[in-house]
Amino acid sequence: MEEKLKKSAFVAALLFTAFSCVNVMAAETVPANSQIYKEAKSLSKVPANSKVFTGKAEVIPMSQQVPGMPVHNGIVIFEPGARTFWHIHPAGQFFTVLRGEGRTGVYGEKARVVKPGDVVICPAGVKHFHGAGPDTQMVQMTVTGDHPEGKGVTWLEEVTDEQYNKIEK
């Protein structure tokens, strides 16, 4: 239990730091004492693009590009065995596993198992994938940097079953 609290505190601190940095950058474009608020019922799931995902996944976009805030975020729900294709984020990404068990990997290396509370930080330009484990759903929250040219991700080839199943022990 204490370990879970430590992980939760770490995740909260990381998110606070990330969004505090964004807040400083956004101070000029967002009026003081105001915020954008979205009720949960206004958020909707959309099927993940089958051209860049293997298996069934859904995306809940939580924010679009906001002037002065160089990130966007969302929740991705991966069904068992579902995963992204290999991809690169020109301005980086981090994600937190909220539920289930998943896998993530960097091209040329063995994949890692990720569990609730784990945080994965993908610096700009790192070719990687993420998705659910073979027998369990995974839900993750992503925060992705917005590249000045407007492209948050470059999609590449499909992750093979061999790459997906090669796990770091």
Go through the PLM ranges and name each one.
Residues 2-12:
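Bacterial N-terminal signal peptides that target proteins for export
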Residues 11-21:
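Bacterial N-terminal signal peptides
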Residues 24-70, 152-169:
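A short, N-terminal "cap"/entry segment at the start of jelly-roll beta-barrel domains
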Residues 73, 135-154:
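A short hydrophobic beta-strand segment most commonly corresponding to one strand
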Residues 75-79, 88-104, 143-146:
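Short, conserved beta-strand element in jelly-roll/cupin
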Residues 86, 104-105, 127-133:
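Short beta-strand His + acidic residue motifs that chelate non-heme Fe in jelly-roll/DSBH
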Residues 108-125:
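Short acidic-glycine-tyrosine-enriched beta hairpin
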